[in-house]
Amino acid sequence: MSAQVIAIDAMGGDFGPRSIVQASIACLSATPSLHLTLVGQPSLLEDLISGLPAADRARLQIVAASEVVGMDERPSQALRGKPDSSMRIALELVRDGKAQACVSAGNTGALMALSRFVLKTLPGIDRPAMVAAIPTQTGYCQLLDLGANVDCSAENLYQFAVMGSVAAQALGVHRPRVALLNIGTEDIKGNQQVKLAATLLQSARGLNYVGFVEGDGLYRGEADVVVCDGFVGNILLKSSEGLATMIGARIEKLFKGGAFARVAGAVAMPLLKRLQADLAPARHNGASFLGLQGIVIKSHGSAGVQGFQSAIQRALIEIQENLPQRLHGRLEDLLP
């Protein structure tokens, strides 16, 4: 298998580079064909990888960056005021063909602005969209947009649907069912932009559009791709993650309530732990910026080692599936 090269913004996120470097080392150990470029402060990064075996160290490069984009900085500040930020340098490595993907846990708005500036969008795409996998009763669905575009036109939603369908196919879904998230399934429901987007999708050639889906239908697995604006999508994503964490905590507390509960817990806990692990936000961490001329994966800023590993794994899949090129080819067929 040919090598995959991923640029890592090692300075992004809420907790600094330690967990990012630990996740990077774990991915190197698990994937012999993987090469990583850590972008950030060299002296700090060298200390964190000092104990790495020589075989893995040979597949790990450090590129210096003197600036860091803060989590509370405006995108315009990152774009104009920090030309040597770790985030920007990582994206430029992708642009220059020195890496095939970029993974960052940094400021979402800044990452999107820099990605659009450095990598540019694919022909026909007005705005990139953030997409991630959401667990359902039957497997997973791809949900987009997750916060990159708070206000969306019908044309934006249509483009998101096309991109989400291609991404789902790249992940192995045959003829993915595409739906618009709405407050009801009837044609009269929804705001004007959602209704107009539905009209566009109904006439789309080669797209398996199945209509509107409500929030509960998403979790029942009624669609493989669910499209909404970034305001709704971000709230849905964060609510889902909070609910999964809360349920896990409540179950653990329940089985510590008394002697009988502890006995029942000893029997049930292995299965419940498996369920908790399957639904854990860390397992599904890593949102893809679809619509760019390059692969960019956004990790949660609060992601730990396991979560950042998941983001790197998503980048690996998109490299292996050559996702931007696949998108470009399908967009020519599906966009009006």
Curated annotation (Swiss-Prot):
InterPro entries: FA_synthesis, Phospholipid_synth_PlsX-like
Localisation: Cytoplasm
Superkingdom per UniProt: Bacteria
GO biological process, one term: fatty acid biosynthetic process
GO molecular function: phosphate:acyl-[acyl carrier protein] acyltransferase activity
Catalyzed reactions: a fatty acyl-[ACP] + phosphate = an acyl phosphate + holo-[ACP]
Enzyme nomenclature, EC number: 2.3.1.274
Record's keyword terms, sorted: Cytoplasm, Lipid biosynthesis, Lipid metabolism, Phospholipid biosynthesis, Phospholipid metabolism, Transferase
GO CC field: cytoplasm
Main location: cytoplasm
Family: Belongs to the PlsX family.
Protein task: Catalyzes the reversible formation of acyl-phosphate (acyl-PO(4)) from acyl-[acyl-carrier-protein] (acyl-ACP). This enzyme utilizes acyl-ACP as fatty acyl donor, but not acyl-CoA.
UniProt subunit comment: Homodimer. Probably interacts with PlsY.
Cross-referenced PANTHER family: FATTY ACID/PHOSPHOLIPID SYNTHESIS PROTEIN PLSX, PHOSPHATE ACYLTRANSFERASE
Protein name listed in UniProt: Phosphate acyltransferase
Organism field: Pseudomonas putida (strain ATCC 700007 / DSM 6899 / JCM 31910 / BCRC 17059 / LMG 24140 / F1)
Source organism phylogeny: Bacteria, Pseudomonadati, Pseudomonadota, Gammaproteobacteria, Pseudomonadales
Gene behind this protein: plsX
